[in-house]
């Protein structure tokens, strides 16, 4: 396997909290898939959850080499968790098309947060 994409993003959680306080769920509805939005609304720390998903999707778009808005939407990237709780990444629509153009077969993701920041790194591999 060869690495064909690498992306990292960091988000200030307080900035997300301020946006949510000012605009409600507008950002969450733009960034999160329906499944992620359901988790967000039930989460004990919704702004922290949103910040981590925002960082993860930005990192994924960077790993794809497009960024958000060049055929890849936040909605085309779903961040979930496996049965052990580790984050997983799934691509659909424009993100999946780009993944196929890269001849990539797998994406790896790491997400972390500490007090004020959320950070994510995505590695995309091809065979």
Swiss-Prot record:
Keyword vocabulary terms for this entry: Cytoplasm, Fatty acid biosynthesis, Fatty acid metabolism, Lipid biosynthesis, Lipid metabolism, Magnesium, Metal-binding, Transferase
InterPro entries in the cross-refs: 4-PPantetheinyl_Trfase_dom, 4-PPantetheinyl_Trfase_dom_sf, ACPS, Ppantetheine-prot_Trfase_dom
Domain of life: Bacteria
Sequence positions that bind Mg(2+): 9, 58
Alphabetized Pfam families for the sequence: ACPS
Chief site of localization: cytoplasm
GO MF annotation terms: holo-[acyl-carrier-protein] synthase activity; magnesium ion binding
EC number(s) stated in the UniProt entry for this protein: 2.7.8.7
Function of the protein: Transfers the 4'-phosphopantetheine moiety from coenzyme A to a Ser of acyl-carrier-protein.
Family: Belongs to the P-Pant transferase superfamily. AcpS family.
Name of this protein: Holo-[acyl-carrier-protein] synthase
Organism: Shewanella baltica (strain OS185)
Lineage of producing organism: Bacteria, Pseudomonadati, Pseudomonadota, Gammaproteobacteria, Alteromonadales
